Structures are given as structure tokens and as C-alpha cells.
């Protein structure tokens, strides 16, 4: 019980939707309402249906999400291919029966049986080139996995924050509906006392209907965002709540000296270019003759004696010197280099854009918070004036809409900040909202 109360108190103190340093009437304090809604939604399911804190969910998803498991299998396959590339060529066993059915010579059979083993050898560095290709392909697979991990972390962070924002919008919509119902009650009382025209009741009822529609849409948005988060994280059951806040989380510090080459996309493109470059060496050595050394024994049919045989085999690159194969490999390297140059430019632009977006969202959040404080104060004054019969209902409804819009802007600003920070972490090659690189 103490842990629950402590968690509730923490939400009241630090929830991102609360206007700071502002005294408001009890019915206008949106942050506690939103905090209670989040707490109830988060603690409503203590079982597996509740999404764990983001850091825990990220580590679980990196190990268990189907998307990550696919790439992990690809890395293991590339590692197995690299190990297989080191294998030596297998020897070949041959048996040859000669002079079957041939006429006897002096009453003796002319049959001869030959048994031999041929061991092929890769000369001219063919084996070393093949091993290098396997290693480069393995490094490229690892780079692709690292890029996928970084991209996945950014996507998961945005999905988690989007679900949290949906809960905030739902709590805001429920509070807006409650305020609309209170205004309708006050309007009916004023109409009954003759202080307002009957039209005011219709206007207040229309406001309630609009608030009900907004609340229904917000509830639907919560369901869809939780379904998206569940599918992305690989959960077998849809989550019914979240257990921590990411909208108010402080990001990991960006390490100094980060360059464009630290981008996972650049590293992946560079690793793929290196793999194609290693393949060129393989193609250039493909025409080198295949050499084999043969040793065996020949048994003569007319006696019990045997003779030994030794041989050397080699292919002759007379018609095929693999010129076109070499040209194709060289062109693949050129294409990979062009992709690397393009990715490097895009990564540089993406990082500059992410840095700019982070700075912009910080300013946007500060402005939205100030606007929310002003709108809350305006609604407080307008509500007191309406209850005293000094403020028209139309003006009160407009002020409440402005308050809802201001709180909505605060939620949107916090979500935009998470998106920008996730994009910056992605550009820097870091897991979003994690210290690790």
C-alpha cells in the first residue's frame, strides 16, 4: 500500500501535464486528475498485460521481438558462413575398372582395377580470398543488426511515448467532459432563476456532446496506441497500461566527438562496401587453375601384383578467364561506394536536423507550459465570473476550449520532444533514452 501511495505522490509531483508554480481550484487541477488516470490505468493490470518501464521493455524487446530475432538469426547464419569459408576442400575418391570383357592374352585376363584419391588445392590465394569474403559478410550482418537495434529503440521509444500521450489525452478529455457537465448544471440553474436565456442550456448541452465525442475518440486512440506498442515489442497479449513516464524522462547525454561516421547507417553501408570489395578479389582469382594431386594403386587382373600411380590435374583457363565476372564485381563496389557517399550525406543532414528539432521542441515545450498556465488562470477567472452571473456562457465555453487546446499543446510538445530526442539518438548510433551505444 505504501508503494502505491508513493507512486501516486510521485505522479502528482512530476507529471508533465501539470502547470508549474500555479495555484488553481481543486476542480481545475488537471495534473492530479491526469496522474490518477495514468496510475489507475497503469496499476489496473499487474499481470503481463501491463507494459513494463521503457528501459525494461527495450531490453526485453531487443531479445524477444520477432523483428530482432530475424536479424539475430541472419547474424548467426553469416557467422556460420564465415566459419564454413575456412574449411579445406574435400578429397575425391575414384575407382576405375578397365578392359572389362576384353579377350584374354595367353590365357590371362587383361582386366585392371585402379583406386585413387585426388586432393584439390587452392593456389594463388583463392582460399584466403574466400575467407575474407566470409568475414566481411559477417561484419556487414553485424552492422545491419546494430543499425536495426538503434532504429528499433527509437521506434519503440516513440511508440511508448505515443501511448503515454494517448493516456494523457484521454484523461484530459474526461476532465473536459466533467467540466462541460458542471457548466451544463450551472447553466440550467441560471436559466431556472431567470438569469440566463433558455438558449444557454442548449449551448451547454452541445458542449457536453462535443466533449463526449472527444472522449470517445481519445479512448479509441489509447486502444490503438497500446496495440501498436504491443505488436512492436512482440507481446503475445495487448498491453492495457504503461508503468512509467517517458514524456518527462531526461535523455542520456550525447557523448562528445560524435561524427557522421558513428551513424549506424554509415557503418552498415561501409561494411557492405567492404564486403563487395572483398568479392572482387575472389572474382579475380577465380580463373586461376584448379590443381589436384592424385595418388593410388592399380591391381592387375592376371597377377596378384599391384602398381602405384601418381598424377597431377589442373584446369586450363582457355575459354573463361572470368573477365565479365570481375567487371560485375567492380561495378558492385562502385555502386556500394555511391550508396555509402549518399548515406553519409543523409546521416549528416539527419543529425543536423535532429539537433535543430531538439532545440526547437525545448522552446516549444516551454512556450506550451506558459500558455497552459495562462489558460488555466483565464478559465479560473471566467468560471468564477460565470457562476457570479458576470461572464457570458459563450465566453466561458471559449475559455475552456482554449484551456483544453493549451493542455493538448503541452502533451504534443512533450511527444515532439521525445521524437526529436529519439531521432538524435538514432543519428548518433545510440539506443534511445539509454546510456549504451
From Swiss-Prot:
Domain of life: Bacteria
InterPro entries: OMF, OMP_efflux
Keyword Signal found: yes
Disulfide bond entries: none
GO biological process: response to cadmium ion
Signal peptide from the UniProt entry: 1-48
GO molecular function: efflux transmembrane transporter activity
Keywords, alphabetical: Cadmium, Cadmium resistance, Cobalt, Nickel, Plasmid, Signal, Transport
Keyword Transport: yes
Gene3D superfamilies: Outer membrane efflux proteins (OEP) (1.20.1600.10)
Family indicated by similarity: Belongs to the outer membrane factor (OMF) (TC 1.B.17) family.
Described function: Component of the NCC cation-efflux system that confers resistance to nickel, cobalt and cadmium.
Protein's name according to its UniProt entry: Nickel-cobalt-cadmium resistance protein NccC
Gene from which this protein is expressed: nccC
